[in-house]
């Protein structure tokens, strides 16, 4: 079962929740990065938050290059989850706590995402662990949300360790269990690390990555 219908519905509900509760669209700090998502004027030199809406991509994002580089087949949901929209990361409440789902802000962001997924998969190979790929963060960024590449199930994972808790048998069922979390935008501070340039959620991945490197 594709995760796309569940993702479509969640993104629609996400913006409707902000409009119903706050009377405005969700806002995001793009840190100078343009996007088709941005509503209204955009000044690349400004550090102000922007209002945004998800935008369907005209040309779908593909992970065929990642599959070719690593000589493996990725679970098909990765193309639906990351390749259908340009959007900001989205916040959620769930039976397992609060968290954030990663999305792709622009084409350069998609390229950076692919680099990070390659890095994550190479780390799993180095540790001789089954392949997973990340979709977001749980509990203030202390835990990653990952998809088991063998069967598409969703798990809690701490970098360097095996996935610890299965949350849902599929990405679609996981997304269906989420509800939008309404919160003001947060301006994330970037840590200096090559090839990890995504504003926001990648800052949390960087912190976890530094914690992992410190253990090795």
Curated annotation (Swiss-Prot):
**Which InterPro entries does the entry mention?**
Syd, Syd_sf
Main subcellular location of this protein, as a coarse class:
membrane
Q: Which family does it belong to?
A: Belongs to the Syd family.
**Function, as annotated:** Interacts with the SecY protein in vivo. May bind preferentially to an uncomplexed state of SecY, thus functioning either as a chelating agent for excess SecY in the cell or as a regulatory factor that negatively controls the translocase function.
Query: What domain of life?
Result: Bacteria
Which keywords does UniProt give here? Cell inner membrane, Cell membrane, Membrane
What is the source species? Answer: Shewanella sp. (strain MR-7)
Looking up Pfam families in the UniProt record yields: Syd (PF07348)
Q: How does it sit in the membrane?
A: Peripheral membrane protein
Protein known as: Protein Syd
Where does it localize? Cell inner membrane
User: Cellular component per GO?
Assistant: cytoplasmic side of plasma membrane
